[in-house]
Amino acid sequence: MRILNDQIPQKDAGRQFGAAPVLLLCFFLYLAASCFILDATRFRAEKPHAETMRLAAEQTARCFAVLKDERLRRGYEIIPTDDPNLTGMVGYDFTEITTSHGSLEAKRSTTNPNTAAMITDLLVQCGVKEGDLVAVNLSSSFPCLNVATLCALDALGAEGVIINSVGASTYGANLPGFVYLDMEQTLLSEGLIRNHSFAFSMGGDYDIGYGMPDQDLVKTIEDRIRGYGLQFLHYKDIDENLAARLELYLGKAGNKDSRNSPVSASDFRCLVNAGGNILAFGGGEGLISAKSGILRPGRKPEEGKGLIPWFLNQGVPVIHLLNMNSLLPENGLPFDPIPLPDPGTGDVYFEMRYRKELVLLLSAGALLLLALTALRFPRRHPIQKGLL
């Protein structure tokens, strides 16, 4: 009579097959419950660099106060219906150097000094620390963001390589006798900022002030800013303009680099772009479709001209500051607040954290359950042939 020895392992395997699916189901239920517990037990805590963020916000508030006084001294009244918080940092609806339409609510939102805390946080997320090089492209449409960026760089001890364009959209820095670079000079004279612009263009169409109705006024502004010692950029061709700017960025960065060695794009920790001047995306549609916040380099090359695609294609992240109605709430700041929050306050300084001890405990439980599940799965047995 022939003995089939493989029948006994098959009986054991049946019992194992019955237990394994149950354990596997328990494992996945445990994971789902763990995720729920971890999410339910998160707690609110200050960000590790909250004090640096507060330093930037408080300095920005001091800058705004000085600029308000200087604006009034120069004869530009504040319109309460446009600037209900009476910050003095909201321009007029239209002037001789207004380049395009802008959102009044967005401009008002940036008068909150805590925007500097947000920018500091974004810089930290890009890895910026003391002594790092940061390329900066500023329009004059959001003067508050510009000042906040300078204060954020100062608070971190970073080195900004900064170029500004003078033209501004509605309610931006569009006061002909008090443009953004006049604001910078005021702050420099008061010793309130360390980082500042070293070059400028007129902005607007073709980035040369084309379309501004009073070209004599444009020339007056140009001459005034040249008197501050800033280098002037004037290129109608976008490719020439971009090449000249990149040469300036890399050349100026080389002067700031303590190693005194050639500088490449990778030596910049990030690019900050505030506003929507033509050099951001080379006048393409990317300016409209790109999300605000941190843009990370992708696997595929970015299409189009402009500083943002160029830096991304060099592997350098970009902090894009433009669409305030989404960017501010995403970072814990209110949109168009009345009254303004005090500097150093708000959700922007906090983050939600998981409880480490609970994470470790639940992870250990998951590993144990996974091990038990693996043990209950049947192993393959060699086929045993019985003999008579």
Residue ranges and their predicted role:
Residues 140-144, 167-171, 204-207, 277-280, ...:
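Solvent-exposed loop/turn segments at secondary-structure junctions
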Residues 1-14, 388:
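N-terminal Lys/Arg-rich, disordered targeting/topogenic segments
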Residues 20-39, 365-369:
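Hydrophobic membrane-insertion alpha-helices, especially the h-region
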Residues 31-47, 373-380:
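Membrane-interface motif at the C-terminal end of an N-terminal transmembrane signal
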Residues 114, 121-126, 130-179:
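Membrane-embedded segments
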Residues 265-266, 270, 277, 284-388:
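C-terminal functional extensions of proteins
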